[in-house]
Amino acid sequence: MKRYLVPLLAACLLLTAGCAKAPDTAEPSADPAAAASAAPETTAAPRFAAGEETAYILCEGKSDGAKALSIWLRSSGMDAAESFVPDGLDAPMYTLPAAERALGEIPAATDETRHVRVAADTELLESGILAVWLPAFESATGYIAEIYAGDASVLAAEAAAGEADVLLMKKADASALGTMTHYGARYDLVSTIYSVI
């Protein structure tokens, strides 16, 4: 199982974005129009493709950290999801469920409950939404989210063992698992017609 940490991902993105461009050492061309026509036109391939709608749900475990993340994602996290437009798209990626937003009080983080283990579908991680959600959650609540990402089989193993506090997975995959003893509550989270390519 691969372990992905949002802070590591964010640091890699910052390092990549901060790299200086190598100086242009090519000799200047006498005819700028000839140089422009010789250079291939660069177009970035889209990172997302439209297709069938995929719904994601949150499966809440029994810890205070699970409850805290669940309430936060279903309240403040909805604002971030509603306006999330990743590079490669011109419109918000996710639509929200019709359900009302959570109004419960978020349990305070303690030394014993501060770490929240989150097992997430790889596509949620790759879309970039977790890099938006989790740092904001940590900042607002004092909890620390530890991310584990994988496909349906990895999430099924996490669910069976109860190793994660929260599962963020495709609704169809969760339905296939049936009753999960470690995760008593399930909530619709977001849906999208886009998939990461």
Predicted segments — roles?
Residues 19-27:
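Bacterial lipoprotein signal-peptidase II cleavage site
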Residues 34-51, 106-197:
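N-terminal segment of the mature folded domain
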Residues 70-94:
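Periplasmic-binding protein-like
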Residues 86-113:
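An extracytoplasmic/periplasmic, membrane-proximal ligand-sensing/linker region
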